[in-house]
Amino acid sequence: MLQVYLVRHGETEWNAARRIQGQSDSPLTANGEHQARLVAQRVSKQGITHVITSDLGRTRRTAQIIAEACGCEVINDPRLRELHMGVLEERLIDSLTPQEEQWRKQMVDGTADGRIPQGESMSELGDRMREALESCLMLPEGSKPLIVSHGIALGCLISTVLGLPAYAERRLRLRNCSLSRVDHQQSPWLASGWIVETAGDVTHLDTPALDELQR
């Protein structure tokens, strides 16, 4: 059985400012660095052999902290990037026009054909995230990889593993530095192939998440 750990990056300056990131980038806050150290401490005893990350700065920094705790190298994989948010990238949520907010809500509410102009669809995101996950099956026997990616991207991936449409990802709450795990197995009791072991675990964190504070 192959176990693959999934970690969302730590809190960023734009998370705190409610600015849309997508494939644009902003650095981790001091709290985001702290979150990364906490999740690194939690997984440091799990025998992680590979830390594979989106090539965006916020994920690479989170991955670096985890890799140092686990004694691994960091492997960059652009397929693990966040959903491209098109014309809404770098925009403050509170500054959106009614039309722009409608585009954003189509994504948040899980609309099958939701796509922000000049952006990426959930189906396209799901396809590249599944490709990245399937690549883990090519690692040497006994490997235990950890993937560092983004909230929408990981939610989309977990949704497809569950057999749900890619756009169902907004039904999953994956907070900054939450820990999830998917396993690939052959089992007489569960579906063969990929299964979800856990999703969105934050028991290692010691402060409320931004979405709790910003309600």
Swiss-Prot record:
<dbReference type="InterPro" id="IPR029033">
    <property type="entry name" value="His_PPase_superfam"/>
</dbReference>
<dbReference type="InterPro" id="IPR023086">
    <property type="entry name" value="Phosphoglycerate_mutase_GpmB"/>
</dbReference>
<keyword id="KW-0324">Glycolysis</keyword>
<comment type="similarity">
    <text>Belongs to the phosphoglycerate mutase family. GpmB subfamily.</text>
</comment>
<dbReference type="InterPro" id="IPR013078">
    <property type="entry name" value="His_Pase_superF_clade-1"/>
</dbReference>
<feature type="binding site">
    <location>
        <begin position="151"/>
        <end position="152"/>
    </location>
    <ligand>
        <name>substrate</name>
    </ligand>
</feature>
<feature type="active site" description="Proton donor/acceptor">
    <location>
        <position position="82"/>
    </location>
</feature>
<dbReference type="GO" id="GO:0016791">
    <property type="term" value="F:phosphatase activity"/>
</dbReference>
<dbReference type="InterPro" id="IPR001345">
    <property type="entry name" value="PG/BPGM_mutase_AS"/>
</dbReference>
<feature type="binding site">
    <location>
        <position position="60"/>
    </location>
    <ligand>
        <name>substrate</name>
    </ligand>
</feature>
<feature type="binding site">
    <location>
        <begin position="82"/>
        <end position="85"/>
    </location>
    <ligand>
        <name>substrate</name>
    </ligand>
</feature>
<dbReference type="GO" id="GO:0004619">
    <property type="term" value="F:phosphoglycerate mutase activity"/>
</dbReference>
<dbReference type="Pfam" id="PF00300">
    <property type="entry name" value="His_Phos_1"/>
</dbReference>
<protein>
    <recommendedName>
        <fullName>Probable phosphoglycerate mutase GpmB</fullName>
        <ecNumber>5.4.2.-</ecNumber>
    </recommendedName>
</protein>
<feature type="binding site">
    <location>
        <begin position="8"/>
        <end position="15"/>
    </location>
    <ligand>
        <name>substrate</name>
    </ligand>
</feature>
<dbReference type="GO" id="GO:0005737">
    <property type="term" value="C:cytoplasm"/>
</dbReference>
<feature type="binding site">
    <location>
        <begin position="21"/>
        <end position="22"/>
    </location>
    <ligand>
        <name>substrate</name>
    </ligand>
</feature>
<feature type="site" description="Transition state stabilizer">
    <location>
        <position position="150"/>
    </location>
</feature>
<dbReference type="InterPro" id="IPR050275">
    <property type="entry name" value="PGM_Phosphatase"/>
</dbReference>
<feature type="active site" description="Tele-phosphohistidine intermediate">
    <location>
        <position position="9"/>
    </location>
</feature>
<feature type="binding site">
    <location>
        <position position="58"/>
    </location>
    <ligand>
        <name>substrate</name>
    </ligand>
</feature>
<keyword id="KW-0413">Isomerase</keyword>
<dbReference type="GO" id="GO:0006096">
    <property type="term" value="P:glycolytic process"/>
</dbReference>
<comment type="pathway">
    <text>Carbohydrate degradation; glycolysis; pyruvate from D-glyceraldehyde 3-phosphate: step 3/5.</text>
</comment>
